[in-house]
Amino acid sequence: MINNRICILGTGAWATALGSRLSLNGNTVFLWGIDNNEVNDINSGYNKKYFGNTKFSSSLSATTDLKTAIGDSKYIIFAIPSTALDSVLDKVKEFLSDKKSQVILINVVKGIDAETSQILSNKIKSKLGSHYYSRLVTLCGPSFATEVFEEKPTVINGTGKNLKIVKQVCELFNSDVFKVIPINDIVGLQVFSSLKNLLAIAVGLSQAEYTSVNTMSAILTMGIEEIQKIACKMKAKKWTIMSFCGIGDIFLTCSSTQSRNYSFGQDLLKKGVEKTIKENKKTVEGFEVYKTAKNIITKYNINAPIFSSIIEVLEGKLDPKEFSKKCLELFWNQKINK
């Protein structure tokens, strides 16, 4: 097993879980963060903010100095909130000029750019150039960070422009409990990974009122159809919906209270929009992406009533208590499938 030097940008749950997996695979892992307390915690063998008093199974190092973190790393992983990607790309760019022939970039940030409605791999391309885009691999799939950290069996997908590099990254992560499977759909993987979070908010909201698997299944069915419409308009491949990054990730995010987006949706009914946003301390990707989803639906003139309704809730235009009632009306108006 080759010992690679790997830099992970981020010290959150996902960054730490992936760092632990890569370290267990025999690599030397450095995490970069801006929170001194988290950095010190990681250097002492813990990330108590996300994993309590569970000690790392292998050694991780962390620093607030970006130059030190990147060092002579062969791989650089972006594992930060999507809202921080712009500023972090600008910082990282300064340290990449002498690494054009070897460094491989890995993106695990989820989202679609709010201003341009472009997938994040294209944002990385616009910031760092075509050379690094050709050496970029994006990972996504059904994976709660806590379960990856606990070494529960997990399967996700990886995609990128260069299939050889994609396979290389897959092998970097693969173990007897963690598997990355290559997929040839850069757009689809990222669109599904983003929009499923907004659907999870819708499902969580409905479950707070009905606590019904029947209702959840109905909303999921219609919501998945809407995601597929949006993805195809953005040039995703139709079959990607049946992959781990498609239906697998949608099911995970829309069916468990471990999902921040699902829990956020439940809180919308219990506490209202304003209070839920104010009290929420963790990143909720679905809330971050709703404006982007609205722009895409409008741009392509897509009929997406479930998405349009949850967007109205998040904009304060529809009372959360009226959301499920509106969904019921949509169910009753469904026509026979041809």
UniProtKB/Swiss-Prot annotation:
Keywords annotated in UniProt: Cytoplasm, Lipid biosynthesis, Lipid metabolism, NAD, NADP, Nucleotide-binding, Oxidoreductase, Phospholipid biosynthesis, Phospholipid metabolism
Keyword Acetylation: no
Pathway where it operates: Membrane lipid metabolism; glycerophospholipid metabolism
Positions with a binding annotation for sn-glycerol 3-phosphate: K110, G141, S143, K196, D249, S259, R260, N261
UniProt-annotated catalytic positions: K196 (proton acceptor)
Top EC group: oxidoreductase
Cross-referenced Gene3D superfamilies: N-(1-d-carboxylethyl)-l-norvaline Dehydrogenase, domain 2, NAD(P)-binding Rossmann-like Domain
Reaction(s) catalysed (UniProt annotation): sn-glycerol 3-phosphate + NAD(+) = dihydroxyacetone phosphate + NADH + H(+); sn-glycerol 3-phosphate + NADP(+) = dihydroxyacetone phosphate + NADPH + H(+)
Primary role: Catalyzes the reduction of the glycolytic intermediate dihydroxyacetone phosphate (DHAP) to sn-glycerol 3-phosphate (G3P), the key precursor for phospholipid synthesis.
PANTHER family: GLYCEROL-3-PHOSPHATE DEHYDROGENASE, GLYCEROL-3-PHOSPHATE DEHYDROGENASE [NAD(+)] 2, CHLOROPLASTIC
Name of the protein in its database record: Glycerol-3-phosphate dehydrogenase [NAD(P)+]
Natural source organism: Malacoplasma penetrans (strain HF-2)
Gene assigned in the entry: gpsA
